[in-house]
Amino acid sequence: MLTGTHLLQLHNGFHLFTRTVGHGPVKLLCVHGGPGSNHTEFENFAAELGEDQVQVSMYDQLGSFYSDQPDYTQPENRQYLSLDYYLSELEEVRQQLGLEDFYLLGHSWGGLLAQEYALKYGQHLKGLIIMSMIDNIAEYAPHVNALRQQTLSTSQVDYMKGIEKAEAFDDPEYRHLVDVLNAHFVCRHPENGPRQLVSTLATPVYNYFQGNNEFVMVGALNGWDQRKNLHQITVPTLLTFGEYDTMPLNVGRRMQQTLPHARLTLTPD
């Protein structure tokens, strides 16, 4: 496999940004979260894991960062706002990168895609890594609501609910409260993460699937649930969560028991 940065042309004509670093025998493909985030969260993985041990590939999904960004208001592009599309995109990336018997890592939304991929294309995998993602949305929504109630005052929570009902998400006080929650549960140490001068989130993609923010789950992912199929993922699987995570750890522990070959780790702070 070629290392470095490349643009892949998909069968649909769009281009995706990809980067491959390292020359080790272990192959790792990383799938970013969001939806609508980007590859930069993985840029130090090869150096930290050892470039002579692991070859790390990453890419920006359609609509994100360096990849093509369709105008989703156009009817012909609405078909690309679907879970099925992003799953097929992941498989096409694998094919074009020539990956076989590889490890797949998915963070957040990428962890959702990784589960879907393991269920449909598991024959290509050597192992699976799911970072901060559970196997359904139904148990996510009440958990983030509980986190909000634990962190903010009753009046602040009521204020946020009122803004959400009115869909006035640009309200300055509301944005401030979202920032407070994000600092507790989404990005506790921004100094350790990628730094961009401007926001790089693909908001049309994020808003469609998620909603306005991590604490409002009103998007197309509502209803996603693989609890009944999770046991069919038979490759060795690492589940990893943060001590302060928007995903409920008790569900992660249940997943560990359900998956035939799984291990769970917890990252403090």
Predicted regions and their residues:
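Conserved alpha/beta-hydrolase "acid-adjacent" motif
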Residues: T246-V251
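Catalytic histidine neighborhood in serine/cysteine hydrolases
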Residues: G252-D269
